[in-house]
Amino acid sequence: MANIASARKRARQAEKNRQHNMALRSRFRTSVKKVLKAVVAGDKEAAQAALKAAVPVIDGTVNKGLIHKNKAARHKSRLNARVKAM
């Protein structure tokens, strides 16, 4: 455990940021899974709606620095291709 006050504060901040990042990453994964689930089910309207909801979530994770912009672009492109192929 840290003894210096600034180190204790940094530990608190790191834990807070870790919790926040985990929540955002979970939202990202959940939104991607919703699109894939709708695609597998064959429900085109639900897949399009899920994709429309997932894109801002994916972009938000990029803005927060959780994933690289190329990874986000790859996810959006692949999800869009799967929805269009229905």
From Swiss-Prot:
Specify the superkingdom.
Bacteria
Provide one Gene Ontology biological process annotation: translation
Q: Name one GO molecular function term.
A: small ribosomal subunit rRNA binding
Task: Please indicate if the UniProt record lists RNA-binding as a keyword.
Answer: yes
Q: Which InterPro entries match?
A: Ribosomal_bS20, Ribosomal_bS20_sf
Which GO cellular component term is one of those annotated?
A: cytosol
Q: Which UniProt keywords apply?
A: Ribonucleoprotein, Ribosomal protein, RNA-binding, rRNA-binding
Q: Where is this region: Disordered?
A: 1-22
Indicate whether RNA-binding appears among the record's keywords: yes
Job description of the protein: Binds directly to 16S ribosomal RNA.
The record's section on NCBIfam families has: S20
Q: Which HAMAP family match?
A: Ribosomal_bS20
Q: Which family does it belong to?
A: Belongs to the bacterial ribosomal protein bS20 family.
The protein depicted here goes by the name Small ribosomal subunit protein bS20
Q: Which organism is it from?
A: Thioalkalivibrio sulfidiphilus (strain HL-EbGR7)
